[in-house]
């Protein structure tokens, strides 16, 4: 899915200026990237708030329009208000199509309900990590990774090597020879 966001350069900075922006329905943010100076920006709160609720937005390549120029960016960080449903600040990183990007991708459990551990042993599959750090070209970043649990039995521990990574995507930990546990299977052993 492609997301497009309109941004404007903000001149005034600081706490007071940020509060005024938020009252006007804008979010203060920053755009940075390799080979460019950081730019203080403002984006529409409603657009970003509802986009952040979608899991795919966090790993998507976003078209950010700034002063008539469109840049490819990814969301690098954002801050939420402690108790209001309000985005306080957002960071965008400009990316180039030919440069690798390091990003955390959500992990989904699939086929667990068909596994022996769940069907016959009354068990369940529990994620130890909800995301995996990967390196990929911006166009190859997946929205999420699937952890296939069709063949698991009670007592199994699933590792990074059990995840089928799409072509052009590499796990940062596996590149360092660290095959971390990502999920456990509980239930009654027979």
Swiss-Prot record:
It comes from the Bacteria. GO terms for biological process: translation. Gene3D superfamilies: Ribosomal protein L25, beta domain, Ribosomal Protein L25, Chain P. Keywords: Ribonucleoprotein, Ribosomal protein, RNA-binding, rRNA-binding. The keyword rRNA-binding applies. It comes from Neisseria meningitidis serogroup B (strain ATCC BAA-335 / MC58). InterPro entries: Rbsml_bL25/Gln-tRNA_synth_N, Ribosomal_bL25/Gln-tRNA_synth, Ribosomal_bL25_b-dom, Ribosomal_bL25_C, Ribosomal_bL25_long, Ribosomal_bL25_short, Ribosomal_L25_dom, Ribosomal_uL5_bac-type. This is Large ribosomal subunit protein bL25. Part of the 50S ribosomal subunit; part of the 5S rRNA/L5/L18/L25 subcomplex. Contacts the 5S rRNA. Binds to the 5S rRNA independently of L5 and L18. PANTHER family: RIBOSOMAL PROTEIN L25/GLN-TRNA SYNTHETASE, ANTI-CODON-BINDING DOMAIN-CONTAINING PROTEIN, RIBOSOMAL PROTEIN L25_GLN-TRNA SYNTHETASE, ANTI-CODON-BINDING DOMAIN-CONTAINING PROTEIN. This is one of the proteins that binds to the 5S RNA in the ribosome where it forms part of the central protuberance. Pfam families: Ribosomal_L25p, Ribosomal_TL5_C.
């Amino acid at each position: 899915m492609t997301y497009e966001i309109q941004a404007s350069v903000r001149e005034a900075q600081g706490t007071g200026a940020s509060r005024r922006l938020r009252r006007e329905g804008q979010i203060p943010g920053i755009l940075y990237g390799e080979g460019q100076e950081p730019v203080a920006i403002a984006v529409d709160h409603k657009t970003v708030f509802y986009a952040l609720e979608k899991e795919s937005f966090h790993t998507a390549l976003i078209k950010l329009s700034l002063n008539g120029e469109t840049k490819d960016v990814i969301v690098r960080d954002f801050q939420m208000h402690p108790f209001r449903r309000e985005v306080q600040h957002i960071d965008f990183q400009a990316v180039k199509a030919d440069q690798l990007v390091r990003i955390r991708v959500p992990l989904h459990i699939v086929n667990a309900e068909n596994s022996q551990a769940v069907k016959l042993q009354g068990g369940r599959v529990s994620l130890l990590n909800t995301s995996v750090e990967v390196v990929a070209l911006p166009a190859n970043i997946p929205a999420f990774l699937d952890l296939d649990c069709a063949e698991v039995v009670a007592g199994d521990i699933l590792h990074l090597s059990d995840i089928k990574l799409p072509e052009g995507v590499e796990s940062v930990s596996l590149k360092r020879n660290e095959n971390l546990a990502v999920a456990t299977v509980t239930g009654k052993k027979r």
